[in-house]
Design a protein with these regions (language model features):
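Buried hydrophobic residues that stabilize the cores of well-folded domains
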Residues: 1-266
C-alpha cells in the first residue's frame, strides 16, 4: 500500500537494500526435484514491477493477476514536500482510466482525494479526518451529487499503529472489502492479521516473523474455509546487495511457492 503522507520511502516498505531503481517479482508453483532442488511450475502468486526515484519513492508500478497477466499500470507524482500528489492509472495498453489527485493541509496530512475518470470528469471525492494525535480515523467517499458511497473507520494503538480497519459502508462495484485487524512487533512490523468478511465473520488469520533485515522468514496462515493453522518457512538466495533473488516457501518441508526477483540499481 502507498503511504500517502511523506516521510520514509518505499524501499523500506518492501523492504529492499541499496539504491534500487526497479524490482520485478514473478511467482510460480514450486515443484520438488529431489532433496534440495526445486523447479518452477506454472505461474501463480504475487507479481509486480516497481520503479523508484533516487530518493526511494515509487514512481511507477505494474499490477498483475495471480497468473502473471498485467492488469494495470500506475504512475505516481509527488509535491515539493514529498507527498503523493497524483496517481494515474492506465490499462496495460496505456489508456488512462483513472486519475487520483491528493490534497494536504499545512501539517502535511492527507485531507482529500479527487477521483477522475479518463476524460477528466470527477467521479468521487474522498475526505479524511484525524484524531488529536494526528492519526487518520475516518475515510468517507462522496459521489458528485453528494451521496455518501463508502466509509472506513480506522482504530490505532497507543503507538499510533493501525490495529483495525472497519468498513461502515461498502464501496459499490468493487470486490467486497472486509474489515482487518492487526498486531505489531517492537519494530512496527505487522505480526498478526485477521481478515473479516463483510458480515463480520473471520475469513483468514495470519502471523508473521521477520529477520533483522525486516524480511518475512516464517509464519502461520489459516486460509478461508479451513479450521487448521498451517506453518510455513521461507528460504532465500540473495544477490550481492543482500536482496533476495529467489524465495521458496515451504510447508511441512515441502516447497509450495517459488518466487524470483530481478533488480536494477542506480
Amino acid at each position: 500500500d502507498i503511504e500517502y503522507a511523506g516521510g520514509g520511502n518505499d524501499w523500506e516498505e518492501i523492504p529492499v537494500r541499496g539504491k534500487v531503481k526497479k524490482v520485478q517479482q514473478r511467482s510460480y508453483v514450486a515443484i520438488a526435484k529431489g532433496p534440495q532442488a526445486v523447479d518452477k511450475g506454472e505461474k501463480k502468486g504475487q507479481f509486480f514491477v516497481y520503479e523508484f526515484g533516487e530518493n526511494g519513492r515509487k514512481v511507477k508500478e505494474e499490477r498483475f493477476t495471480e497468473a502473471g497477466v498485467c492488469r494495470e499500470k500506475i504512475q505516481y507524482e509527488y509535491d515539493e514536500n514529498g507527498n503523493l500528489s497524483k496517481e494515474s492509472h492506465y490499462t496495460p495498453a496505456g489508456v488512462l482510466t483513472v486519475n487520483k489527485n491528493y490534497g494536504y493541509d499545512k501539517e502535511g496530512r492527507l485531507k482529500h482525494c479527487s477521483i477522475l475518470d479518463g476524460k477528466g470528469e470527477i467521479m468521487q471525492r474522498d475526505v479524511y479526518r484525524y484524531d488529536i494525535e494526528g492519526n487518520m480515523v475516518q475515510e468517507v467517499g462522496y459521489l458528485t451529487n453528494g451521496t455518501k458511497c463508502s466509509e472506513f473507520r480506522y482504530i490505532y494503538d497507543s503507538y499510533g499503529q493501525q490495529i483495525e480497519r472497519k468498513v461502515l459502508l461498502q464501496p459499490e462495484g468493487s470486490d467486497p472489502v472486509g474489515s482487518v485487524r492487526r498486531g505489531y512487533n517492537f519494530q512496527g512490523r505487522v505480526v498478526f492479521e485477521e481478515y473479516l468478511s463483510p458480515d463480520g465473520t473471520s475469513q483468514s488469520q495470519h502471523t508473521y516473523r521477520y529477520n533483522i533485515k525486516g524480511e518475512l522468514v516464517s509464519g502461520t496462515e489459516r486460509p478461508e474455509g479451513q479450521t487448521e493453522e498451517v506453518k510455513y518457512v521461507y528460504k532465500f538466495h540473495n544477490d550481492n546487495q543482500g536482496n533476495w533473488k529467489i524465495r521458496i516457501k515451504y510447508i511441512d518441508d515441502v516447497p509450495v511457492v517459488y518466487e524470483e526477483r530481478e533488480y536494477t540499481y542506480y
